Amino acid sequence: VPFPVNLCTLSQIFHEPFTKEKAQQYFQKVQQDPQSCKTFEDIAIASVGADLYEMFYKHYTEKQWGMPCKELDASIFSRIPIRLNNDQRYFSDRYQGIPKAGFTAMMKRMLNAKMHILLNTDYQQIKDEISYEKLIYTGPLDAYYDYCYGHLPYRCLRFAFETHDTPSYQQAAVINYPNDYDYTRITEFKKLTG
């Protein structure tokens, strides 16, 4: 079903058409007072109810963060929109797009001859040897500070690229897999780029 939660999601789950008004009534029935919510689990259940929490948020979030929702801060929930319309996009910006020639070409055009780029370089080994007005560091944050506050617990991602000889592999550009799968989502890029 479509995600983030929207009218299409509710219609498919409950097997009946949902309007904005009907969705508002549903959420008024299942919502709780968010004032005392301190964890992701608390705020998610208070916002969408226990059923939608179990269906969409709990397992996906725990898989993504590698921690129980009871241990995650409530602020994390705010990154996931809940829509009272049929918009199935994750972002709702008025203008969204992908560079016509791709991101690599865009970055090449942005580069300037006055820029000095160091790749595969340990910042700690060169920091006293370089001078700069502005520095863009793209390594681990804790490494930048030479681990003075210890190591941050990082999660890694593994991307598996596959090519399928079919006009359409799945219904939407991005489909999340919240339950017992070894992966969190599948993206069909041609649906993003047209």
Task: Please place each PLM-identified region on the residue numbering.
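Mid-domain catalytic core of redox enzymes
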Residues: T121-G194
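Active-site/ligand-binding neighborhood in enzyme catalytic cores
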Residues: L7-K134, T138-Y145
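N-terminal FAD cofactor-binding segment of flavoenzymes
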Residues: V1
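Short aromatic/basic micro-patch
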Residues: P4
